[in-house]
Amino acid sequence: MDERVKEAIFRQVGKEPFAKKFGLQLVELGAGYSKVEMTFTPDMENLFGMAHGGALFALIDEAFETASNSHGTLAVALNLNTTYVSSPAPGSRLTAEAREFSRTNKTANYDIRVTDDKGTLIASCQALVYRKGSPLPFL
């Protein structure tokens, strides 16, 4: 992976308002791979006291966004198909890992899995991006 791209993505995530709001932390980044973490806090609960799907989706999307843009080419989401498997315990540290499993000049596909700090599968997602062909604007 190009170190300039890696540094730029880490820098952008560090100042992204949405990532700050949810406490999303980019911890690993490689070509077609990303690991993002967050802590499940009480303000992320739904009306049943469980993890809100939107909070989990935010974690998934951040891993997807960073993995799909790791090649230095601007990539935007086309489709995400998410399955929520279980609800994490309050205070759990959650990890989303996005792995690229196919890429062409125009599209790329990713498998994203969310686990808690005990290794329990919380959610899984298959996602598709459109690769615009232009470099990342913040390089």
Language model features with spans:
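Terminal targeting signals and extreme-terminal segments of soluble enzymes
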Residues: 1-139
